[in-house]
Amino acid sequence: MQPLPITRSLEHTHSAAAVSTLGTACCSCQLSLACVPCGLSRINQQPHPVMLFSRHRRLAGEILYRKGEPFHAVHAVRSGALKSAMTLADGRTQVAGFHMPGEVLGFDGVASGRHQCTVTALEDTQTCAVAYEPLLALATRLPLVQRDLHRLMSLELARAQWQMLLLGSMSAAERLAALLLDLSRRAAARGHSPTEFNLRMSRCDIGSYLGVTAETVCRLLSGFKASNLLEVDTRRVRFLDLPAFARIYSATVNWRPSRLHGEASARWGQALE
């Protein structure tokens, strides 16, 4: 699958034209503000970026990268959504995460030089790929980029630890509640309503991620609906009383995986009042 061209490839250049092209590519993105918390847009604020930057497009069901493929770049989700999945030797598959616009993925390949999971588009998706070695070189020269790179890696570790807690210590209802609250925060981080959003993933994918069956996911959603906590219309979820939902499942509220800034933080806080 060929990357979707932006304007032209940028590789090891310091020219003013190249800097302008790279900056324009991010400025034209509707999610440029959402990417600032992720850190990658800081690259374009530096005077002399040395980057290889490309945009990729995947249709629903297409692979962004596979387990075992060489690691070359990290990806910022520009639009759409993806899932990452691990496959055991016997063929069993476990969904390991969901990736939304403004978020960064791909760090699973840093340690071994090869990706440890397969990432698939849940819907038509665009990502911006940043070559890792030039990014690492830039981070050694620019403390702000280095700090954000470390924070992104730390976030990946924190997410993995949270998922271990999710699967090992919570009931099925708490697991689903934790995921819904997480998706609510992530919607707020993108500037959307924290009380109404689409589930980009199927019930089967949700069940795989939570370690329960798709039937259990459907039953729990019906239970939340019967309790007048939320409405579910196919993939559309609307919280009827988000503060009450958060209070009932208070054990899940302490985890804030999406770093909220400014208006997004205020939006999430108001939704819980």
Language model features: what each stretch is:
Residues 79, 133-134, 155, 204, ...:
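Alpha-helix/helix-capping structural signal
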Residues 97-162:
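Cyclic-nucleotide recognition modules
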Residues 2-60, 104-105, 110-111:
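Cyclic nucleotide-binding regulatory module and flanking cytosolic helices
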Residues 60, 100-101, 131, 153, ...:
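A secondary-structure boundary/capping signal
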Residues 140-213:
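Polybasic "coupling" helices that flank or enter modular domains
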Residues 37, 46-47, 60-124:
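Cyclic nucleotide-binding regulatory domains
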Residues 55, 74, 98, 129, ...:
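Short aromatic/basic micro-patch
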